Amino acid sequence: MKPEQEQTIVENHLRQRGFRWTNQRALIVRMALGTHDHFTADELLLRCRAADPRVSRATVYRTLAVLEEAGFVEGLDTGDGGRRFEHVIGHDRHDHMVCDVCGRIFEFRDDEIERRQALAAKRIGFRVARQTLRIHGTCRRCQRAERGERP
């Protein structure tokens, strides 16, 4: 799906929910959908302010909350008190491993896990709307640091 199509889908959804489609909100959505890494709300704010210094923190946070509630972005608690987001519209499904020490997020996809989740849902007659798998632990770099080794 093209970025313009993604933005139109989000715009229509927000308008249907009674939100005004302002220049700031359009910029926030464009930046969030155009970011292909895991970002914090403050990182998104900085990216938006680079394009328009008038973008408000409150509008970024409100817009992210609406985007998350609608399923256009997914919020990930990093285990260190932080929260990172990624846009999911137009992306292949994948899962995450989150380092509870440094907050780094690793994406992965495992066909066997997918197969087992589908079988579990089928076994109990459950229709899956969306699913997420987050594995929390300690990454290799932080494990080495804990042992006093160089990363």
Feature roles, as predicted:
Residues Q5-G18:
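Short, Lys/Arg-enriched N-terminal segment that forms or immediately precedes the first helix
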Residues Q7, Q24-R25:
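Short, leucine-enriched amphipathic alpha-helices that occur as contiguous helical runs
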Residues A26-M31:
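Pre-recognition alpha-helix immediately N-terminal to the DNA-recognition helix
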Residues T35-T40:
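Short capping segments at the starts of secondary-structure elements
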Residues E43-R49:
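A short acidic, leucine-rich amphipathic alpha-helix
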Residues V60-A70:
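Basic amphipathic alpha-helical segments that dock to polyanions
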Residues A70-P151:
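Non-DNA-binding regulatory cores of transcription-related proteins
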